[in-house]
Amino acid sequence: MSKPHVPPVDPAEVPALALATIKAAKFPMLATMDGDQPRLRPVSPVRTEGFTIYVANLRRYGKTAEIAANPKVELCYCDADHHQVRITGVAEVLTDRPLLEEIWASNPLLRAYLGSLDNPELIIYRIVPNQVRYMREWALEYFEVPL
């Protein structure tokens, strides 16, 4: 079996390629730490602003305690072509009421399940990136995305 051909990546195109991968993949995997045990689960972002990702959560979910104990997280997007974007950052609880209202208004699923923005079960995390990396399928190397 021959090695797959991977077209070269122009470093100037890396930010756009990474954003396109995020848009195509839609549902990233979120990694957290549960003590010394990594935990990974799919999440459904409720808002994306460049490489800052907003994720809804319920207080009773395991990731609530994990993020409270260690807010360092990583999101991994992988699209149908196996291009990857890894966003390493810090998850913070969103408290900006106008932004919460905007997210609430634009997400019918949140409204259907939770009934009210003031539902005490609802938490929205803003994942602020400190590193973003992109890899084209089979390239086996990551490109740093400038922040």
What are these regions (language model features)?
Residues 1-10, 84-147:
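Charged, gly/pro-rich active-site loop segments
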Residues 1-28:
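Extreme N-terminal tail/first-helix region
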Residues 11-16, 57-60, 108-110:
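Charged, amphipathic alpha-helical segments
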Residues 20-34, 73-77:
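A short, Trp-centered hydrophobic/proline-enriched beta-strand micro-motif
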Residues 25, 70, 107:
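Acidic-histidine catalytic/liganding microenvironments
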Residues 27-55:
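N-terminal leader/targeting helix
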Residues 29, 52-54, 74, 86, ...:
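General beta-strand recognition
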Residues 46-82:
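A short mixed-secondary-structure module that forms the rim of ligand-binding clefts
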